[in-house]
Design a protein with these regions (language model features):
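Acidic, glycine-anchored loop motifs typical of Ca2+
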Residues: 11-13
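Generic structural signal for well-ordered alpha-helices
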Residues: 149-154, 199
């Protein structure tokens, strides 16, 4: 038996918590990504994603002028690990998105002991918003893409050792230049590397944390097929969400099912 499961009582139900941004938070209906994962796996799935957020925070310490940081990955993960949602609840009252207070309340009410899997997916928003990819001198810096991932997973893992983590990478996307034209996210470096650089660093960070990793960049939606799966420069259509849900199910769920049983 895995030591991380020691002392943990299995309730017989596989329960998944999805964290991230638009791939999970937009279009939460039958065609939604979390809903399709639930349909394909038979698991109970909770959707704790926030639209328009990023993995990395913008500021090193919280700034009331930028409430989205309170819903970036490390802040959400720390709230789940500590049970202290005060900052998220306060910030949610200033959000124009009515889903923010609702999702925050759902997360606060979750029994994390019942969660078996945390699935994390952010699209290319960190790249587009020029969030630093990593800081070799501060591997858990929350203002970097990989630092926030490490800090957040480590915080939740320390609080709930039984939880298994799955990191789903971003897909292909474009950035939009000053003239309003699309530019290939894997050819244009906005200052912190191209999309494939972010992918490799995310893989390294996931490996550091013992998380499973699913490559959606080379493995799912790329520059050759994105027109079939995306509505614009970054957002997925129903077919795109179905493809990612199928990839999650095919790759990780079988391994995790064996791990949990």
């Amino acid at each position: 038996v895995d030591q991380r499961l020691e002392g943990h009582e299995d309730d017989g139900v596989t329960t998944i918590l999805c964290l991230g941004d638009d791939p999970f938070s937009l279009d939460q209906g039958e065609g939604g990504l979390a809903e399709q994962i639930a349909a394909k796996t038979g698991a109970t799935v909770y959707n704790g994603a926030f639209t328009g957020t990023t993995m990395a925070a913008q500021y090193e310490s919280y700034n009331d002028g930028y409430i989205l940081d309170a819903f970036s990955f490390s802040y959400v993960a720390d709230a789940l690990a500590s049970g202290d949602f005060d900052l998220m609840k306060q910030a949610a009252t200033y959000s124009y998105d009515e889903a923010f207070p609702r999702t925050t309340a759902m997360l606060e009410g979750l029994d994390m002991n019942a969660i078996d899997i945390v699935c994390i997916m952010y699209d290319g928003s960190d790249y587009i918003n020029k969030r630093p990819c990593d800081d070799p001198n501060a591997p858990e810096s929350i203002i970097t893409y990989t630092g926030a991932l490490r800090e957040g997973i480590n915080a939740m893992q320390a609080a709930y050792p039984h939880i298994r983590f799955v990191v789903m990478s971003h897909t292909f996307c474009h950035t939009i230049n000053e003239e309003g034209n699309f530019e290939n996210g894997d050819r244009v470096d906005l200052g912190n590397g191209t999309l494939s650089h972010y992918l490799q660093k995310e893989l390294d960070a996931a490996s550091d944390c013992g998380a499973s990793f699913i490559d959606n960049f080379y493995g799912s939606i790329n520059e050759d097929n994105y027109l079939d799966y995306m509505t614009d420069y970054i957002h997925l259509n129903d077919a795109g969400r179905e493809l990612l849900a199928r990839r999650f199910t095919d790759i990780s769920f079988l391994f995790i099912f064996l791990y949990l049983n």
